[in-house]
Every structure is written in C-alpha cells, then in structure tokens.
C-alpha cells in the first residue's frame, strides 16, 4: 500500500493534523470545508477512492473553487507497466476485461480530465515531493482542486 508509510509520517509530524474520513467522498467535503475555514488541506486518496468520490469532488470542491490539492496514490500503475500498457490505452471492452490489468489506473487520468482537474503523474519516488509541491502550489494559484498521481511506491 503506497499510502501506509505516508500516513505514518503525517501522523507523526508535529505541525500536521491528520484528519481521516470514513469514505472518500467525505474526505473531499471535509477538505473543502477546512479550506473554506482558512486551513490548507491536502487530500491523500487512492485512485480507487478518487473514482468513488466523484460527486463530492464535482459538486463541492470544484464548484466552489476550493484550493484543495490531492495526492492520489496510483493503484494499478505498476501492474499496467508490467503488462506493457500506457495510461492512454483505448478503454475497449477487451481491454477493460483483461485479467492482468487493474483498470483503476487507466481510468484515473481520463476521469480527472473529464472532471477538469489538472494533474501530474509521478513514476519515480525521487520526484514525488516536487510533484506534490507543484500540485499544492497549483491549487493555491488557480483556486481549484488539483492532483498529483504518485504511481510509484513511497518508502
């Protein structure tokens, strides 16, 4: 799980308050509310959860122009690369039913595009921090949700 070491580090950090949610859509709404109250939230979410949270992201954070950056851990990207597949693979029935593909990864980026969420994908751990910082800065500058997809393990 890419998120586990990150949650451990965040939970131990003295100046970060970790707020967990029961559902991913709830996390989006809570972050938008925190932003509205003057906080600077960062949503940490797996790409499967991103797909579940669509209505909250569209109907709350995006519509209100909430500067809420998302760190999206990229389930399925390693498996996709191992199978020789790129994120822009045509999403045909044959592709989506392949047993060697976790379709979460190839659906993540088109979904963000459809929702109008700017994103950047990082596939190497050494660039993860810079990618996340760019998403945070972009959210603040553009006053909208943004995303950093971390498609590599974080140690």
Where in the sequence are the language-model features?
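Thiamine diphosphate
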Residues: 1-155
């Amino acid at each position: 799980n890419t998120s586990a070491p990150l949650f451990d580090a965040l939970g131990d950090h003295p100046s970060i308050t970790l707020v967990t949610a029961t559902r991913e859509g709830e996390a989006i709404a809570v972050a938008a509310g925190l932003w509205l109250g003057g906080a600077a939230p960062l949503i940490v979410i797996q790409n499967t959860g991103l797909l579940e949270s669509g209505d909250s992201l569209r109907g709350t954070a995006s519509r209100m122009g909430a500067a809420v950056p998302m760190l999206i851990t990229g389930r399925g990207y390693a498996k996709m690369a191992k199978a020789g597949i790129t994120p822009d693979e045509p999403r045909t029935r044959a592709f989506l039913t392949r047993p060697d593909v976790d379709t979460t990864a190839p659906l993540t980026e088109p979904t963000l595009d459809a929702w109008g969420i700017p994103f950047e994908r990082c596939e190497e751990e050494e660039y993860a921090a810079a990618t996340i910082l760019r998403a945070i800065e972009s959210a603040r500058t553009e006053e909208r949700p943004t995303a950093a997809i971390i498609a590599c393990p974080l140690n």
